[in-house]
């Protein structure tokens, strides 16, 4: 969702990998309470200072994605987006900068199994902005389970 057009909206609790607060929902019966967990400042500060905690890892990863997004002209809030059909288990679209100088192809494997996608263009010379080198075998892009890549022209 961070790669969609517009300004990313992220629930505060998502920054820390907080699961739904089902206990609060059961007590109140209010659907919105499921994602309204109230953090104690001291508690979250302690968790963030531990680089191995789930909260610290989530915060670091999401902060990194937002930092990468901020530097890409193709992720300008008004840059265009066009869907790309790579199959029912792969969600993909293309973002193009307003000045047409940068294109980013966002591809996500929605399944728990390896997926292969045939790309019409040669993307192996492009840069994956958010991960390691992309894997291409027999002209097919290989995506690990739940993997997301952002392929950029620059």
Task: List each model region and its residues.
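Surface-exposed beta-strand/loop patches in extracellular or lumenal glycoproteins
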Residues: 110-124
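C-terminal beta-strand-rich structural cap/linker in extracellular carbohydrate-active enzymes
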Residues: 137-154
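Residues immediately flanking
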Residues: 109-110, 153
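Short aromatic-acidic-glycine turn motif
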Residues: 124-132
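Short acidic, Pro/Gly- and aromatic-enriched capping/linker segments at domain boundaries
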Residues: 3-6, 131-137
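Loop/helix patches that line or flank the sugar-binding groove of alpha-linked glycan CAZymes
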Residues: 1-104, 112-115
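Short, exposed beta-strand/loop patches in secreted or surface proteins that constitute
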Residues: 81-84, 133-136, 141
């Amino acid at each position: 969702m961070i790669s969609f057009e517009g300004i990313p909206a992220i629930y505060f609790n998502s920054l820390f990998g907080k699961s739904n607060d089902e206990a609060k929902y059961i007590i109140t019966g209010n659907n919105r309470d499921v994602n309204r967990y109230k953090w104690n400042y001291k508690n979250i500060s302690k968790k963030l200072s531990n680089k191995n905690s789930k909260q610290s890892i989530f915060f670091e990863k999401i902060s990194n994605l937002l930092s990468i997004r901020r530097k890409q002209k193709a992720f300008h809030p008004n840059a265009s987006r066009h869907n790309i059909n790579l199959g029912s288990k792969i969600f993909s679209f293309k973002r193009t900068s307003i000045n047409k100088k940068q294109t980013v192809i966002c591809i996500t494997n929605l399944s728990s199994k390896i997926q292969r996608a045939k790309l019409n263009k040669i993307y192996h010379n492009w840069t994956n902005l958010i991960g390691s080198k992309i894997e291409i075998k027999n002209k097919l892009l290989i995506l690990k389970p739940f993997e997301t890549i952002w392929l950029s022209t620059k």
